[in-house]
Amino acid sequence: MTAALLPVIIILLFVLRQNLIVVLGVATAYAYWAFGDGVVSNIVVDAWDAANKDILLSIPLFILAGNIMSRGGMAARLIDLMKSLTAPIPGGLAIATILSCAAFAAVSGSGTVTLLAIGTLMYPALINAGYPKSFALGALCAAGTLGIVIPPSIPLILYGIMTQTSIGDLFIAGIGPALVLTFLMLVYAITRNFGHKEGNWDLEYVLRSLKNGIWALLMPIIILGGIYTGYFTATESAAVAVVYSIIVETFIHKEMKWATLYEVISETTKLLGSLFPVLMIALSLNVFLTYEEVPQNLVAWLSQRIDNPVTALLGINFFLLIIGCLIDIGSAILILAPMLGPIAYSQGIDPIHFGIIMVMNLEIGYLTPPLGLNLIIAMGIFKEKFWTVCKSTIPFLLIMLIGLMLVSFIPRISLFLIN
């Protein structure tokens, strides 16, 4: 009876729309009191021990780097480059939109930042070029989510922290699935807009755009190349990303003043003030659950009812798709990764592969009502009705579900670069 109250408390607090820190705080305190030694103050001790990790520094640093680039000129330069490359192709501007989102996601590491930075520039351009509003909205909302799986990805960092999985390997594993999703979106964009042609090939324009956008293109190469050649760790790569973005936007592009940089740092600091307490409580709960062998007991119970990896994958995918509709991706990873991970591992699913599957499921949640974050952001910045935005994403939701199934049941898509 005591154990059964814990999920009831969590669900009740979510129904009452309490902040995540309240939900996790109450759940953790109850768990320590009911199942531990009764000393609730041990939460602080366990949280401190669990949070004493260098890798946690990568989260604020990657967020800061993404915010700097979204306020600078990298987004516009990447868009210009993609437009120059796709001009002679039917549906060229649609292709440029998706490629710009993918490229900026590889620079910023954030889906919402990608939607804001690329969407504000490309949505008017698509409408003025005669593209259907439904396609423009859907393409930007869906392609904006690519930042969730393309490295450097904050959700992948969170998964790595909560499951003790190599973040560098997660970054590399995200490349294959990101390419699959991007390819599927491009195929749809071309077939949907085959009649549109924006212009002819202009080598001078391409070279000029490449020169202007080269610094943005170099960043993911430097970050991932540095990690996998051993020059720096995942944490150090985040610091490199911040320094690189400041140098490029301030001294090379000269599109960011010091006052603007101060504003960006201040805004990022406020965001982290709400993020880190939640993360520390989640880590404390993770320590407690591991000590009490809750994941191990859950695995033992489910192993008697799940007889093969296919059943496990289908069940986990379905569960995570539902969760993605109701809970934001960070909260879902903090709460569920330590619980679902051991279940997947017990069925022979690689931890790296499962991390990609989990993030892709929750990525789809960005496009599903009632709490789809990209839907809400698009409604605000594009001044459209919520259900208009929702309907525009339906074709892309189907595309992303196809991509999810391919990645789930063909592990080589995630693991071939690592292996």
Annotate each predicted stretch with a short phrase.
Residues M1-N419:
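Alpha-helical transmembrane segments of multi-pass membrane transport proteins
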